[in-house]
């Protein structure tokens, strides 16, 4: 039993290190946002291609026991939480919560985003006009 406790203690130490590293990452991201705001009038700096390149680099170099798909989800949530340090993304989507649109928005933008449901296509576009959301997720046929 002592061996299991030793392993758990090591996991706890790693968890503590992960929290410190995630917080350090957040601090650096805030600094990047401050630098970007000096150069741009934009108040939001979501850069999807940067996120894609990070996910590609991390999954390519992993070599560990976690499947790449799991790493993608972990990093999606880190990106979402990091963006929320500035201001959460506001994602408009068609339908109530738990619909396919809502689930797709969570998968793409993470749980730290703010999700704004709309009952019809007209109201979802009105959200953009009123600046109530920064991104729309609509079904394209």
Residue ranges and their predicted role:
Residues 1-141:
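Domain-level signature for soluble enzymes in the chorismate/prephenate branch of the shikimate pathway
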